[in-house]
Swiss-Prot record:
This is UPF0758 protein ECA0145. PANTHER family: DNA REPAIR PROTEIN RADC (PTHR30471), UPF0758 PROTEIN YEES-RELATED (PTHR30471:SF3). GO terms for biological process: proteolysis. It comes from Pectobacterium atrosepticum (strain SCRI 1043 / ATCC BAA-672). Residues 99-221 form the MPN domain.
């Protein structure tokens, strides 16, 4: 659907607030300019249609933009800067709040990090005794459908970070977040290894495309 001229996105934001803007209008503000014969709003709508959603646009790799008309290096860096600002906003929140009190925010943060990765990545959030995030680390990178995980290395990094608790996470590049039996088995091994040093594993989140599954919510931890 083509763009019809109306209230400009910047003017709409000032008058009605940022929450009143569509995804395309917000994106247009960051893109700033369109192409010869293509208004910036139309460019924003075209990009969202091509990638399928704002989330997929923001998390796409640079190679995915090669066939995106109107997205040179300047606009690509603008888009990735927005995505990185969003990631840092989520992290600043998790660093100040109990990560277990808002599992949805934790899941969204991990989706930003993992959901569009082409290989399985096993990541750990290291938490202090108030469940504030100290840092995160990608511990292991595997293939398109598996990743080899070593519990002792996770324990070693937890001790280095002086972590009192952990949240585990890994992605399924297939897009389906349903945990496998292997996922459950390795989680049990990590929980047992950590308990020996009184480090708690609070959750394990499996990240898909636009969805995630929490072991804690299912009562598996």
């Amino acid at each position: 659907m083509g763009w019809e001229k109306g209230l400009a996105p910047r003017e709409k934001l000032v008058r009605l607030g940022a929450e009143s803007l569509t995804d395309a209008e917000l994106l247009a503000i960051f893109l700033r300019t369109g192409l010869p014969g293509v208004h910036v709003m139309q460019l924003a709508e075209n990009l969202l249609a091509q990638f399928g959603s704002l989330y997929q646009l923001m998390t796409a790799e640079q190679s995915a933009f090669h066939n995106a008309r109107g997205v040179g290096i300047s606009k690509y860096t603008q888009i990735k800067a927005i995505a990185e600002l969003s990631r840092r906003l989520f992290f600043s929140r998790l660093a100040k709040e109990d990560a277990m009190l808002n599992p949805e925010a934790t899941g969204q943060y991990l989706q930003l990090l993992l959901s569009r990765r082409e290989r399985e990545v096993f990541l750990v959030l290291f938490l202090d005794n108030q469940h504030h995030v100290i840092r995160h680390q990608e511990m292991f990178v595997g293939t398109i459908n598996s990743v080899e995980v070593h519990p002792r290395e996770i324990v070693r990094e937890a001790l280095k970070a002086n972590a009192a608790a952990l949240i585990l996470a890994h992605n399924h590049p297939s897009g389906k977040a349903e945990p496998s039996q292997a996922d459950r088995a390795i989680t049990e091994q990590i929980v047992k290894a950590c308990l020996l040093l009184e480090i708690r594993v609070l959750d394990h989140l499996v990240i898909g495309h636009g969805e995630f599954v929490s072991f804690a919510e299912r009562g598996w931890i």
